Amino acid sequence: MSQTARSAPVRAGGEFFAAPAEAAHRRYEALRAYLYEGLSAAEAAQRFGYTTASLLSAARDFRAGRRDFFVQPRPGPKSAPAKQAARAKVIELRRAGHSIYEIAEDLARSDTPLNRTGVAEICAEEGFGRLWTRPAAERGGPRRETLPRADVADFATLPAQAETRVAGLLLAIPDLLQLDLPALVHAAGYPSTAKIPATSYLLSLLALKLVGIRRVSHVEDLAADPGAALFAGLAALPKTTALTTYSYRLEHRKQLHFLAALDKATLAAGLATGDEINLDFHAVMHWGQDPALEKHYVPRRSQRTRSVLTFFAEDADTHTLLYANADLAKATQAGEVLAFADHWNTTTGRYPGLLIFDSKVTTQAQLAELDDRGIRFLTLRARSPKLTASLHALPAKAWTALTVARAGGKTRRVQVHEDSAARLTAYPRTVRQLAVTGLGHDEPTILITNDHDRTTKALIETYAQRMNIEQRLAEAIRSFSLDALAGAVPLNVDLDVVLSVLAHTVCAALRRRLPGYATATPDTLQRRFLHTGGHIINHSNHITVRLDRRAYSPVLRQADLPTITVPWWGHRQLHYEFA
């Protein structure tokens, strides 16, 4: 609404009051005209560009005391006691050539502490200029402690006793030996360096996963800890550059060989059955703008954004992760189900008994290829308007009532319509189709499968358990920082997701040794056991790990933790004690 100014001002400068520019000033003049000068609400509102209702609302707020037009200034303190107390010392140190950082550090140890901002203000007030950058030797002490170099552990020079924050990390060694980690590394063909064996490299990276270090670049949190180094058979862990560049020496084929050997060991240890396997994709978001990365749908952001697409497989019976791949692209992602089936056939000599996955994982053409190979699948069918309408048109007698099991020992009553010869658009044969209502959705859930032997109830309950793989991925994010992208190069992420599978398998094996923890999640194991501190006692020919007393120490005393021989310790024995 246009603003109508009052008559021309009597004196110069009066236009400031006739045509106020600021919102608060305009509101003040409008209220003054209405409340003091006696203009009607309509006249005052028109003069200053308000609607009548807006002006009356402003008047109501003013009368209620909710409008302050003139704020009294509140001057701040005229002196800075802390600066004044430290001024003489700051001037003395600055004249001696010390930097602002060094002066602040020195004052922090005195009775007149002052932060860097205060020191900088004093230097500016006293006319001191900026110091040129000086050689490190002239700038005072080092900012960070020099960490020990990574090398193979020399047990002859190790101290007789050392304190560690992660003594609990060594609880994972018996299960790593049961899986025969050195043989897995050899099967993968992972390279060694002049100083560090391949097994120690992998154990160094695994240690970060098991204790919940979010990124490889945070390795310095553990780099000087003797427990973490001993876990890997080293005098000290490799540092950031060595660990982050190790993946550049690898290729996807090596990860496949490692997973094949790991899956064999997992099956032999009874950690998986391989009969029914859940499959799913997971996009790991990239926070930069790398144009080389494709855009994928990221559930956490509810949008498509640049990310690295990963693929996981989980044993449906034991919930152990079996497979991971980050070497994917949009053009090839639909074929990943077949790639996993071939991997499993190569590893075990047979195809999986049943593959369970979401409708977005693959295409109908790939489903036909699975059927050609005799691989059974169970997946969702997308609901089209035509299909939904046809289901709504079915008579009540076409639906069969069933009671299906739910998590936690509960049950649910559902209605099912089964079509044993349903047709798909791009699938050359018929499939068995189950339309299910009563699962908490507005529209029927439609399952399709080429399995004509399992009962309807068994198929519905089996697909309901597919959500377990999403729980495993949530555990990997929470415990192993799966969503902390290892880099913009998928090759880096490929090794990282394989390490997450290995860490998950180790935790699955460890919890079997702990009474009452058969279903514990990895983050629970980390918090209660793997993060336990303690002491490492070197007896020359064997090592004793004495774990500190904690609330959960009784569980460890009852656990199956045998004395074992560790190959990467020069075949020395490992023995556990509890304080």
Which positions does each model-derived feature cover?
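An anionic, glycine-rich sequence signature occurring as long contiguous blocks
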Residues: 149, 155, 368, 373-478, ...
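Short, basic interhelical loop/turn and adjoining N-cap
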Residues: 46-57, 108-121, 194-195, 224-242
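A short, amphipathic alpha-helix used for macromolecular contacts
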Residues: 80-113
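Short, Lys/Arg-enriched anionic-surface-contact patches
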Residues: 3-27, 72-85, 190-197
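Dynamic "connector" segments at or just before major functional cores
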Residues: 15-22, 27, 135-303, 310-330, ...
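Short amphipathic alpha-helical "interface-anchor" segments enriched in bulky aromatics
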Residues: 219, 455-490, 495, 499, ...
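Short, amphipathic alpha-helical "recognition" segments used to contact nucleic acids or chromatin
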Residues: 23-39, 85-98, 202-210
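Short, basic alpha-helical/linker "hinge" immediately adjacent to a nucleic-acid-recognition surface
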Residues: 41-42, 46-47, 51-92, 117, ...
